[in-house]
Amino acid sequence: MTTIVSVRRNNKVVIAGDGQVSLGNTVMKGNARKVRRLYNNQVLAGFAGGTADAFTLFERFESKLQMHQGHLTKAAVELAKDWRSDRALRKLEALLAVADETASLIITGNGDVVQPENDLIAIGSGGAYAQAAATALLENTDLDAREIAEKALNIAGDICVFTNHHHTVEELESTVELPKPTA
């Protein structure tokens, strides 16, 4: 599988992922690009799961973004509806992490759309390790979103055999002032 992590801090959002593609217990490729920019570079997306399945979902999600003029939540909900109702899509095994300048979402294979706590997303085989690392870094450091995502991926790559240290990182800067999280 893989590890994808998304962190939002100080008006920046990052989605980062490793590059490992595995077939069973064999590494087939180490430099796959599992994080992309979509919709005129205004949306970031990363996938964990089957590569062919993820490309299908990227295409579907991008068409939903076009249909809804880049509105992230509407596009995600419409994709999730299709994912639930379309027999071919229901067989796809992948998770998507998506973000724009105002929201971060997880779109799951069973058609759920989840807005994570603290705008932190970590999915894939190393997701739990990356989430733990990113949470600790968010709570105890002043590192920026990119540094946190990269460090979390490195920690996941040290622990998870299906995650490597070849990273793709995409970053958006928000022009919208977001409310500060409350304790």
Curated annotation (Swiss-Prot):
Molecular function (GO) terms for this protein are: metal ion binding; threonine-type endopeptidase activity
Where would you say this protein principally sits, based on its record? cytoplasm
Q: How is its activity regulated?
A: Allosterically activated by HslU binding.
- Catalytic activity annotation: ATP-dependent cleavage of peptide bonds with broad specificity
Enzyme Commission numbers on file: 3.4.25.2
Note the PROSITE patterns from the entry.
PROTEASOME_BETA_2 (PS51476)
Keywords carried by this UniProt record: Allosteric enzyme, Cytoplasm, Hydrolase, Metal-binding, Protease, Sodium, Threonine protease
A Pfam family (short name) is Proteasome
Q: What is one cellular component GO term in this UniProt entry?
A: HslUV protease complex
Binding sites annotated in the UniProt record for Na(+): G157, C160, T163
An example Gene Ontology biological process: proteolysis involved in protein catabolic process
What CDD domains is this protein classified in?
protease_HslV
**What compartments host this protein?**
Cytoplasm
| Annotated catalytic residues | T2
Cited function: Protease subunit of a proteasome-like degradation complex believed to be a general protein degrading machinery.
**Tell me, how does this one assemble?**
A double ring-shaped homohexamer of HslV is capped on each side by a ring-shaped HslU homohexamer. The assembly of the HslU/HslV complex is dependent on binding of ATP.
Q: Which NCBIfam families match?
A: ATP_dep_HslV, PRK05456.1
**What is the similarity comment for this entry?**
Belongs to the peptidase T1B family. HslV subfamily.
What protein name is recorded for this chain? ATP-dependent protease subunit HslV
Q: Which gene encodes it?
A: hslV
